[in-house]
Amino acid sequence: YYEYLPSLGINLPAYQGFDESTDPRISNGFATIAFRMGHSQITNLTVRLGPGYEVMDIAKNITMADGFWDPGRMLKEGGISPVLRGAAVTTQAANDIYYVHDLRNSMFGDPGFGGLDMCAIDIQRGRDHGVADYNSYRQALGLDPVTNWSEVSSDSEVVARLNQAYPDVSNADPILP
């Protein structure tokens, strides 16, 4: 709460105690879109470091594709401490439109045999759940709708990719922008 939420621009007030008037339910849109937000923050490597934060011979970094089907490997090769040290010094990836290679090409597939595309799954999940388009969510949050992608990003590559995928901003899936 003290590091991750502020990295998203969220600063929560101090806890004031239980409030029974708070509605604990979540919307379909939140469960379908917001809970997937972190997928673009996943990195391809699980970094493992020794006690002095050096690269270890016994416990090399593990790619997501290799470690997904063999999570016990982390314990067999050096234990959990190298993973925790690696996580402590690994910079959080940006929340953006980019999914790493292993999420785009190897998800749920046996190593060496391909797999599914997590980005495509996230987009299709939104469509299956009938969530509204990007501009509808902007308006529901009190934001003005956008008419072109340059209003969303100043990165010309991001704008070009979004234009290619969604020439009409009004038809954009809300998971991407």
Please describe what each predicted stretch is.
Residues 1-177:
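Polyanionic, low-complexity segments and short acidic motifs
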